[in-house]
Amino acid sequence: MVADVLLTHFNQLFCLNDPGHPLTGQEMKKATIVEDGYIAIKDGLIVALGSGEPDAELVGPQTIMRSYKGKIATPGIIDCHTHLVYGGSREHEFAKKLAGVSYLDILAQGGGILSTVRATRSASFDNLYQKSKRLLDYMLLHGVTTVEAKSGYGLDWETEKRQLDVVAALEKDHPIDLVSTFMAAHAIPEEYKGNPKAYLDVIIKDMLPVVKEKNLAEFCDIFCEKNVFTADESRYLLSKAKEMGFKLRIHADEIASIGGVDVAAELSAVSAEHLMMITNDGIAKLIGAGVIGNLLPATTFSLMEDTYAPARKMIDAGMAITLSTDSNPGSCPTANMQFVMQLGCFMLRLTPIEVLNAVTINAAYSVNRQERVGSLTVGKEADIAIFDAPNIDYPFYFFATNLIHQVYKKGQLTVDRGRIL
């Protein structure tokens, strides 16, 4: 087979043997590092991988040849938890955070999520589209090729649908692949204050059926937290969503452990998000149910908290984990997955191999794209992040700098030295 594109002489390729399930425990610690590696691409797919000189049959008169001495290649990075589409910003809350006002106290004062809800409700489709596109561009320039994007800053049907429509439009227009999550249960809207059950009934009866009918989202999520939605309320919504055919996620054990992990395990959610306050019993329940733990260390950093999710304990117990940005305007205003990956080492005490497994193959399972992306594997799409680094440890050791040299998306050179092509 003659390749369309042949990428050769990488210092290292980060490869793994996909076992057919998210990596857990000791599997997280393993990878195949191919020295002097090459990748052959045809019709947007990886058709060959190896070390040294490529087979002659891969090279034809039209084959594009590129050498990458001094560089490494990983699968395209996957950010599997973002609140991508929103209006406004919340830098006016930053001084309050520095003064020690808590996230929940800011929310109780009408700030936080509710502040962004007001800004998003008043934002036009075009405003939200352009703002979200800029964030996606930034992500792409940092090596991200697939992104999960939630609604949840509307808390009414008109705005929630506008957010989902923006995600759908960007999925068509932008190189990054987007996976949509419906999260109208992100907070209790002011018009339903004191009556969350009534709001959940509106979501279940009036919103979820339309989202499903129009295929606007693949996943459903809820914020199970003190002063937001209880475990029983979360169970009520997610069980109805599951009956309608949605895959499930849940924000759980972020600030307080109130039973969200139990709901995730009972309903076999694909992932449970945050988990800073998870207990040993909670870890065991998620392992038993096969739920992926999606950890968001940049949120802990941004909130200036000391309690990071116990990633080391999770992996050693046999749990599958991913890492994501939680990109949002309040608790985590960043879109930089490289920073998150570095926090995975510095604050969660993970190794570079564990972090790379978390943000590639496990993240692919978390967004139900494991058949297409998440590993440098023959037959998968050629989503490739190329780092200006001599080995896989270097992008973690040399922190706070964008080391992306190039990005390939479905076999097309999409980013070249800081420019989107």
UniProtKB/Swiss-Prot annotation:
Fe(3+) binds at residues 81, 83, 251, 326. The keyword Zinc applies. Pathway: Amino-acid degradation; L-histidine degradation into L-glutamate; N-formimidoyl-L-glutamate from L-histidine: step 3/3. N-formimidoyl-L-glutamate binds at residues 153, 328, 330. GO terms for biological process: L-histidine catabolic process to glutamate and formamide; L-histidine catabolic process to glutamate and formate. Its main location: cytoplasm. It comes from the Bacteria. One of its GO terms (cellular component) is cytoplasm. Coiled coil: none annotated. Its EC number is 3.5.2.7. The keyword NAD does not apply. It catalyses: 4-imidazolone-5-propanoate + H2O = N-formimidoyl-L-glutamate. 4-imidazolone-5-propanoate binds at residues 90, 153, 186, 254, 331. Zn(2+) binds at residues 81, 83, 251, 326. It is found in: Cytoplasm. Its cofactor is Zn(2+); Fe(3+). GO terms for molecular function: imidazolonepropionase activity; iron ion binding; zinc ion binding. Binds 1 zinc or iron ion per subunit. Keywords: Cytoplasm, Histidine metabolism, Hydrolase, Iron, Metal-binding, Zinc. Catalyzes the hydrolytic cleavage of the carbon-nitrogen bond in imidazolone-5-propanoate to yield N-formimidoyl-L-glutamate. It is the third step in the universal histidine degradation pathway. Belongs to the metallo-dependent hydrolases superfamily. HutI family. HAMAP family: HutI. This is Imidazolonepropionase.
